[in-house]
Amino acid sequence: MRVSRRTGTPRRSRDSGDTVAAFFTVTENLLKTKPFQDITVAEIITRTPHSRSSFYHHFDGKVDVLVALATSVLDNAYRGPGLWDAQPGRSRARAMHASIGPTIAMWTDHGDVVGAVIEQMHTTPVVAQVWKETFDKFVTAVSAQLTQQWIHEEITFPASSATMATILVCGIERTFYVSSRGLDRRLPAPESAVEAIEWITLTAVQGRKPQNMAPAAAVFSPQPHLERAIDGTSTARAEQTDSTADSILDALRSLLLEAPLDKVSVAKITARAQVSRSTFYFYFDNKNAAFAALYRGLAEAAAAGLRRLHTIDRTNASLVETTLTEWLQIDDHAVAIMRSALHEWPRRAELRTVYREGMSAMADILESILIQDRTDGVALAGPPPDQFAAVLLWTVERSIAGALAGEDHLDDLGQVISSLSALLTSAIYGR
C-alpha cells in the first residue's frame, strides 16, 4: 500500500498488508507514550523488522502513516449503513442514537490515533481532510434531521440547521477527545459523557425538554471544590508580575494581532517590548510559558464573566441568554489570544495545564449554578451536573475554536455565539 499525499488515501497491493500493519501498530503504540510531533520516522522503522526503503515504499513520511492509519480507523468504525443513510425522521433519530456506540468504541480503542488527528488538523491540511470527511457526514445528517424537526414543530434557533448541527458535532468531537485523553476529571471516560451529549442533542432537535430521557435526581449536594466557585474566588494560580513582565506580555499580545503564535519568536517579543533576551528569560522559560501567562489572565476574566450568572434572576430565560451572550463576546485582542490558545493547547504542555485550569474553573461555576437552580426548581432535572457542565463548556470551546478558524458553517462568530447562548439556556432551563 502506498499513500497519496494529495488525497490521503492508500493504494493497496495484495502483498503489502502485513508490512503496513506493522507500521500502523508501531505508530499507534508510540502515540500512547508521546505526541505525534515528537515521533520520528526512525523510531517507527526501528521498532519493526522492516527496512527504511520498505517504509518509504509505502509512505512519504510520518504524516502519511497517520493519514492512512486514521483513514483505516474511521472506515472500520463506521463500516456499513450509517447515520447518513437513514431517512430524516424517526429512522434518523434512531440512527443518531445508535451512532454513539461505534463512536465510543472508536475513541476507546483508538483514541490515541484520533486524538493525534485532532491535535494536528489545524496545522496539517492533509490530516484535517481525513477528519473532515467523517465530520461533514455527521453534520449533513444531523442538519437534515434538524431541518425536518424544526419545520414540523415550528421551532426556531438563531442559526441555520447546518450551523447548529456543526455546533453539536463539534461538542461531541471535543468531549470525546478530552475524555479519552484524561483531560477533564468530570469526564473520566467517553461513556461518562453520553447522557449529557444526548440531552444537548435532543434540546437542539426538539427545542424543548427532552421527553424520552429519564431525569436525573433533582437535588444535589454541593461538593467542596464548588464552594470556591460560589463565593467568587478564583482557583487559578496567581501570577507574580511587575511592569517589565507586563511589558513583555503586552508585546506578545500586540504581536498576536499580526501573526499566530507559531510565527511569533522570542526575538520579535523582545524587540517589541524593548527588553533584552536575558530579561525575557528572567521572567519566562520560553515563548510558550509567556503565552500561558497571557492566556491565564484571559481565562480568569472569562470565569469572572460566567460568574455573573450568580447575580441575575435566572427565572428569566431571556436574561440568562443575554448574560451568556455577553459572556461569550470577544474583543480583538482576546480573539488574537484565543485563536492561538484554542488551536495550540492540545499540542503545548505549558499551555495545556493553564487551559485545563481555566476550563475547570468555569465548570465549577456552571456546576454550582446547575445544582442551585435544580434544587430551587428553576432548572430542568437532567444529566449529572458535573458531567453536564463539562460537556456544555467543551461544546462552547470547540465551537468558538471552529468559528475563529473559519470552519464551514461557523464562519459567522456572532451567529455562533447567539446559537450557543440559546442552546445552553434551552438545555438548562427549557424554552
Regions found by a protein language model. Name each.
Residues M1-T7, T140, A144-Q148, T166, ...:
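C-terminal peripheral helix-coil segments that are non-catalytic and often amphipathic
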Residues G17-E43, R47, P224, A229-K268:
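Short, amphipathic alpha-helix enriched in basic
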Residues T19, F23, K62, L69, ...:
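Hydrophobic/aromatic residues within well-ordered alpha-helical segments
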Residues L30-D64, A68, L255-A289, A293:
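Helix-turn-helix
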Residues F59, E119-T124, F284, H343-R348:
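Short helix-capping/turn signature of helix-turn-helix
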Residues D64, A68, G82-D109, S161-L168, ...:
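Hydrophobic alpha-helical connector segments
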Residues P81-P88, V114-M121, Q149-E153, T175-L183, ...:
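Secondary-structure edge/capping motif, primarily at the C-terminal ends of alpha-helices
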Residues A105-D109, G115-I118, P125-I151, A162-T166, ...:
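Amphipathic alpha-helical packing segments from all-alpha helical-bundle domains
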